[in-house]
Amino acid sequence: MKIIVNFDFIQQELAGKTDVFEVADGTILGDLLRMIDAKIMEAGKNKNIDTTYKTTLAGSQLNGCVVFINGSAPEKMLEHRLHGEDNIEFVYGFCGG
């Protein structure tokens, strides 16, 4: 299924403004965030940019951000099951500390 991700200004220099991720049915948000972080870290490595404060996760918790799915923050954020065409947005002040 396709999940639309809108990156926050903190991430945009590494991930672009928007991307579409293809994930398996039943994927949870935590798994998608790990995929996103891998993309951010690879881009940071290629551009020689520190990604410590640009990733979505710090260990097994959110890295200072709020994640909205279709306009609202789910209660059990990292365990939330995604659905096709979900729209993910990051709100910083927040992601990356």
Label each PLM-derived region with a short phrase.
Residues 1-96:
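Ubiquitin-like/PB1-type beta-grasp interaction modules and other compact soluble beta-rich domains
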